[in-house]
């Protein structure tokens, strides 16, 4: 690998002939860059923004070797399972066509659409298999079916992983600086910090990214992409367009009401799952977690700001995406090994790993955490290399006045 600076952005991207490996960490890590692991004195208050007393090599060494093995047959079995459930749910709901059944169908099918997204996400990381062609074909089928441009999103998600925890360079649910926050118009603030509206943000993010950033996941000349990625982006946008055309045709064949019930409402449930899960993996801990700039940022320190979450019965359905810390540090580990890899890494991570609150059958406990974070986490300081979220005390009074 070699680092190459994007001509349109100050952030750095990994340059490799194999795009699947662009979202990973080096196979060998210099273990001399950090001091040996030492036990923290019990009387010392833990500072989550302090450099950790371990490095990536220490964590990697603790993870069993078999956790890195990708089994394409096992990965494909999950695809077959999820697609079978999706079609069975749609067929059952259409056959029964009962208003007592439809709400249950919407929740179940929306959750399954989200499960399809996670499998496509694994294809984008290359953790689905070692075959880039298989990853690309399966990823396009899964993501296009739920109106996600596979390569466009894969590339922006690569940027997210390579810059996780960096105030300016992170891509997903990154904090706004106070200057950018204050430059937002009132409708944008209302949308961004009001539930449930903010949980519907994903399609708008695909079209126009986040406040303070420019470009689109659909346009090959976007700031998100390098010139060599143009054909990939065009391919995914074409697949997205083909799916959109198919949905329009089905609308004429089946009728708009049937399409609304079978696809449109589950699609938006899927969007809410996606925003809910991805937001809480980077926000909402009871103690404020740091965000970094400049020399204070490193791949390891940024990755340690992510959070694991327990989703109860949903853990298995959405492929243990809640085991997020190890996934962020080592995205090449297949999802079916993440729980074991996390357990093995915990002794090394120590207090830098934050044990998630245990969920009941459904992750209802996370709703209060989400609401609290949306209310309190608005922006970070324009200055400083280690910063924490701050709240705008006037935001909701301003929103109320605007609404009236």
From Swiss-Prot:
Subcellular location(s) of the protein: Plastid, Chloroplast membrane
Look up the record and name the pathway of this protein: Lipid metabolism; polyunsaturated fatty acid biosynthesis
The kind of enzyme this is, by top-level EC class, is oxidoreductase
Where does the record place the region Disordered? Answer: 28-50
Please give the chief subcellular localization of this protein: plastid
GO annotations of cellular component type: chloroplast membrane
Motif Histidine box-3 — list its residue ranges.
Answer: 324-328
CDD domains under this entry?
Delta12-FADS-like
A UniProt-annotated Pfam family: FA_desaturase
The answer to whether keyword Lipid metabolism applies is yes
Q: Where is this motif: Histidine box-1?
A: 121-125
* Membrane topology classification: Peripheral membrane protein
Keyword terms: Chloroplast, Fatty acid biosynthesis, Fatty acid metabolism, Lipid biosynthesis, Lipid metabolism, Membrane, Oxidoreductase, Plastid, Transit peptide
Q: Per the Swiss-Prot or TrEMBL record, what residue ranges does the short sequence motif Histidine box-2 cover?
A: 157-161
The processes (GO biological process) annotated in the record are: unsaturated fatty acid biosynthetic process
Q: What family is this?
A: Belongs to the fatty acid desaturase type 1 family.
Q: What is known of its domains?
A: The histidine box domains may contain the active site and/or be involved in metal ion binding.
Q: What is known about what this protein does? A: Chloroplast omega-3 fatty acid desaturase introduces the third double bond in the biosynthesis of 16:3 and 18:3 fatty acids, important constituents of plant membranes. It is thought to use ferredoxin as an electron donor and to act on fatty acids esterified to galactolipids, sulfolipids and phosphatidylglycerol.
The name of this protein is Omega-3 fatty acid desaturase, chloroplastic
- Supply the source organism for this entry: Brassica napus
């Amino acid at each position: 690998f070699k680092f190459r600076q994007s001509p349109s952005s100050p952030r750095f991207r990994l340059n490799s002939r194999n795009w699947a490996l662009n979202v990973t960490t080096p196979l060998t890590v210099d273990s001399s860059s950090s001091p040996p692991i030492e036990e923290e004195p019990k009387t010392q208050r833990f500072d989550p923004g302090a450099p950790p007393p371990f490095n990536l090599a220490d964590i990697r060494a603790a993870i069993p070797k078999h956790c890195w093995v990708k089994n394409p047959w096992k990965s494909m079995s999950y695809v077959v399972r999820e697609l079978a459930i999706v079609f069975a749910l749609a067929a059952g709901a259409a056959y029964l066509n009962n208003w007592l059944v439809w709400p249950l169908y919407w929740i179940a099918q929306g959750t399954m659409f989200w499960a399809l997204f996670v499998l496509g996400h694994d294809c984008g990381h290359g953790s689905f298999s070692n075959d880039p062609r298989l990853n690309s074909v399966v990823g396009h089928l899964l993501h296009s079916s739920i109106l996600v441009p596979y390569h466009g999103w894969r590339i922006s998600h690569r940027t997210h992983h390579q810059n996780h925890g960096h105030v300016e360079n992170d891509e997903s649910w990154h904090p706004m600086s106070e200057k950018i926050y204050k430059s937002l118009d009132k409708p944008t603030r209302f949308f961004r910090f009001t539930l449930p509206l903010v949980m519907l943000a994903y399609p708008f993010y695909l079209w126009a990214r986040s406040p303070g950033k420019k470009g689109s996941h659909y346009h090959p000349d976007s700031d998100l992409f390098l010139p060599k990625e143009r054909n990939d982006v065009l391919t995914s946008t074409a697949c997205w367009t083909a799916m959109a055309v198919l949905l329009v045709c089905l609308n004429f064949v089946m009728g708009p009401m049937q399409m609304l019930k079978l696809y449109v409402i589950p699609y938006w449930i899927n969007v809410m799952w996606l925003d809910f899960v991805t937001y809480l993996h980077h926000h909402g801990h009871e103690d404020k977690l740091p965000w970094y700039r400049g020399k204070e940022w490193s791949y390891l320190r940024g990755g340690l700001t992510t959070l694991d979450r327990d989703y109860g019965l949903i853990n298995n359905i959405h492929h243990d995406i809640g085991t997020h810390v190890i996934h962020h540090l080592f995205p090449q580990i297949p999802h079916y090994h993440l729980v074991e890899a996390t357990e093995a890494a915990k002794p090394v991570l120590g207090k830098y790993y934050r044990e998630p609150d245990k969920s009941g059958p459904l992750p209802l406990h996370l709703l209060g955490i989400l609401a609290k974070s949306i209310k309190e986490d608005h922006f970070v300081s324009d200055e400083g290399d280690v910063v924490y979220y701050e709240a705008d005390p006037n935001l909701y009074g301003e929103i109320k006045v605007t609404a009236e």
